[in-house]
Amino acid sequence: MRPIAKVPFPPSSWRKWAGSIGGMDSLTQRMPFVTAFYRALGTGMVISVDSPIDDKVRSAMESLIEDYEHVLSRFRNDSLIAAIGKAEHGGSFDFPDWCAPLFDLYDALFSATSGAIDPCVGEDLIRLGYDASLSFTVTQDAPEHLGALRGRAVWGRDVTRHGTTLVTHEPMQLDFGACGKGYLVDLLGRMLQSSQFVIDAGGDLLIHAEQPISVALEDPEDQSHAIGIAHIANGALCASAPSRRHWNVAVNERTQIAIHHLLNAIDGLPAQQTEASWAYIPANATLNLARDYPTAVADGLATALFVSDVAQLQRTFDFTYATLDESRQIAVSRNFPAELFLRSA
């Protein structure tokens, strides 16, 4: 691994997101038509295309986003996920057909990470304060209940799946955030008729362009700096970092500990030692899930890189990546499509 050097974003031409699009003047010229869904999944989405999105397609996109959140959001009291969490004796819950590939991906991630990625981690997130009301207050009984190791429900054992039907026997707090945003990006991308487009969902990018788009890799310690620049023409690049979503919890009058949302589902605790990750899936990926839903897979892998061994993930998924650890050392795979600002060792 090599230490990195920080390079400032040119202030007039870079967006400051975890996977930020650089060279905005060039992008505006190549894809001048912009459609924004500012509230989608809490982060917003911006779609740049080379030809206008007609009103019918935009309306269909809005309907899809609404349906998606109504089914999968644990922050909505009227969602299907919320209903599963309220079912005192569990039940059989039928999801839309479009959920099947998402569940397939979670099956694959659960297996590839030996359970470190698990939708049942929603219960741990709630105990740590990342609940529907965003209380950021840890429950008193959290230490005794966090993670599968302490008896929390487990995907495939306590939640069984039959196609797009999930069966439970008690209230279950599920969270599909590890790759849910990327999956919505893929579904929206399928609705576009433009030959060139970029969907930017707060760090999750799906790019189809004739010439590469420059993407700044944001430094998690200083969002005004980049640690590298990726160049992507066709594929998905997703970033993950706790710096965007973290809170402090008081242990006593003098001590606070930092909590974030990237949990290892096995012990239910925030992942340590990694500060940021980037995962890239090319448009010509060979694995069916990656070829059909590249952003979802890249999104899930960017999270999995925090809690699982890279070699273990590569036995299931074909991807390239970069990770930045807490000592400012960066690891990068061969063929990762970025130039990184490295210092000499």
List each model region and its residues.
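Mature catalytic core of soluble alpha/beta enzymes
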Residues: 2-345
